[in-house]
């Protein structure tokens, strides 16, 4: 079964997940994972809510920041549609750190999936 991912749309949703979620600090990114979601998220047809914060500190060029966002979205699609992933509702905010754009894709996938799978169940 293919699971659906939707993005967090406004500042209120980001603040809510920041308040309810648990933070995990890694070498290349910071994760905020909220397993207990408020009613507005539970009524949705989507299983996974994704928020991405890419600061201008990371890179001044919008092209590079957008590439980082595309990589993160693709990583999440791979992780959520993996056979080991169970369909539970959760929200996640990913904040990349310096050096994120230089790391190869397979290493990022391994790191991100390890952290997400370990902390949402």
From Swiss-Prot:
Catalysis: reaction(s): Endonucleolytic cleavage of RNA, removing 5'-extranucleotides from tRNA precursor
SUPFAM superfamilies xref list: Ribosomal protein S5 domain 2-like
A single GO BP: tRNA 5'-leader removal
Gene3D superfamilies: 3.30.230.10
A GO cellular component entry from the record: ribonuclease P complex
Keyword RNA-binding assigned: yes
Name of a matching Pfam family: Ribonuclease_P
UniProt keyword list: Endonuclease, Hydrolase, Nuclease, RNA-binding, tRNA processing
Single annotated GO MF: tRNA binding
Keyword tRNA processing carried by entry: yes
EC number: 3.1.26.5
Broadest EC class assigned to this enzyme: hydrolase
Function per UniProt: RNaseP catalyzes the removal of the 5'-leader sequence from pre-tRNA to produce the mature 5'-terminus. It can also cleave other RNA substrates such as 4.5S RNA. The protein component plays an auxiliary but essential role in vivo by binding to the 5'-leader sequence and broadening the substrate specificity of the ribozyme.
UniProt similarity note: Belongs to the RnpA family.
Assembly and oligomerization: Consists of a catalytic RNA component (M1 or rnpB) and a protein subunit.
Entry protein name: Ribonuclease P protein component
Gene: rnpA
